[in-house]
């Protein structure tokens, strides 16, 4: 069984037991979370969400992605600006997908 749910402004297609990376959630490692904004479950599409559908997950890890470097350069002006960014993420494992 698969489901598509929404969190952090993005949509994720998941199956039970799958590990996914989502935008940072303010939760501790080992805590459980339920997503009720389920867009699709095994072929039944919601308008906009499927009623009584829930995706349950457990937080595995909190971390930061690989650093990206941003360089802004103006030619002939001897101006160079460097900046780095590491996007925070939360790794989840999908425990169950249920429709009541």
From Swiss-Prot:
The record lists the organism as: Ureaplasma urealyticum serovar 10 (strain ATCC 33699 / Western)
Name recorded for this polypeptide: Large ribosomal subunit protein bL21
Cited Pfam families: Ribosomal_L21p
Name the family the entry cites: Belongs to the bacterial ribosomal protein bL21 family.
| GO cellular component annotations of the record | cytoplasm; ribonucleoprotein complex; ribosome
InterPro entries from the UniProt entry: bL21-like, bL21-like_sf, Ribosomal_bL21, Ribosomal_bL21_CS
Q: Which Gene Ontology BP annotations are present?
A: translation
Q: Which PROSITE patterns match?
A: RIBOSOMAL_L21
State the encoding gene. Answer: rplU
- What are the top taxonomic ranks of the organism? Bacteria, Bacillati, Mycoplasmatota, Mycoplasmoidales, Mycoplasmoidaceae
- Alphabetical UniProt keywords: Ribonucleoprotein, Ribosomal protein, RNA-binding, rRNA-binding
Q: Subunit structure, per the record? A: Part of the 50S ribosomal subunit. Contacts protein L20.
Does this UniProt record's set of keywords contain Nucleotidyltransferase? no
Q: What does this protein do?
A: This protein binds to 23S rRNA in the presence of protein L20.
Q: Which GO terms describe its molecular function?
A: rRNA binding; structural constituent of ribosome
